[in-house]
Amino acid sequence: DRLSESWLSLYRSGSCPSLVLAHSARGLMDKFNQSIWSTESSGSEELDDKQPLSQGCAAWFADSNKKALLAEVGVGTLDQAMMAVMPFKHNNLRLLGLSDKILLADEIHAYDAYMSRILESLIEHQARSGNSTILLSATLSQQQRDRLVAAFARGAGSRAEAPLLRYDDYPWLTQVIGQEVVSQHVATRKEV
């Protein structure tokens, strides 16, 4: 629901980007179901001249998690993106779907060692492809941060390293920009 309030603001006014929810509960989201075209709405499998073709594309993207990343905006579990760098059937389709996209992942501190390594591979691929990655965590350790920064730097062809942080630097923001890693303290609100 939070995304439904804000995702269109990322696009030009009047545009109609495709949105796909790539998780199992997508059928429970009324706004999402209303945003995609289905043959039940017209009662026919024939194209209706009154329905924009973009709705047909959105429905095609939404009918399979394998195609979900091809939509302009996709929301789902990170494993859908991770399968792009794993030896799965149709991983090349997922890689294509990630091209020219910003990967946004939350709660990245929660992954075990195995999943963290796959995430590092995904981040490295994103950087190698010239794509941006935004990783969010409230409790990411220095070691985890260093490995993720190193993965992005490798993909970008950089040898940049994350500077050490002191305990009182938390919370922090880290950016890999070209050959440089910038880390800075982030001010917090007094009340939440």
Question: For each of these PLM feature ranges, what is it?
Answer:
Residues D1-V192:
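N-terminal helicase ATP-binding lobe
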